[in-house]
């Protein structure tokens, strides 16, 4: 059995709704609160426990994207660019 190409990571400091919005801006369509489908890919979003130091709490989102290799090779760098720029 061959598995589909995929990537996943956990991002701190971004709410789930904003991660979902970024994926929609990159050509996806929201099909559920935690799923965005794009051409050749599907993303699953999961809110994970906040990172906390003292009274400071930072939200985190786990992202798992699978699909065809060509679609992921286009999506990943575009998404990473949005995640490193303040405000997308």
Q: Where in the sequence are the language-model features?
A:
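Terminal, regulation- and interaction-focused segments at domain boundaries
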Residues: 1-22
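A short, structured beta-strand/loop element
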Residues: 37-56
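Short, ordered beta-strand-loop transition motifs
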Residues: 1, 30-37, 55-58
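A generic structural signal for short beta-strands and their flanking turns/coil linkers
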Residues: 5-7, 39, 59-61
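Short secondary-structure junctions
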Residues: 24-34, 86
């Amino acid at each position: 059995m061959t598995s589909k190409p995929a990537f996943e990571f956990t991002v701190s400091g971004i709410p789930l709704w904003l991660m979902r919005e970024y994926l929609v801006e990159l050509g996806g369509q929201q099909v559920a609160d935690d799923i965005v489908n794009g051409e050749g890919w599907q993303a699953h979003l999961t809110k994970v426990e906040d990172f906390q130091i003292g009274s400071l709490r930072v939200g985190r989102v786990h992202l798992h994207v699978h699909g065809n290799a060509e679609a992921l090779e286009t999506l990943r760098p575009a998404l990473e660019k949005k995640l490193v720029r303040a405000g997308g």
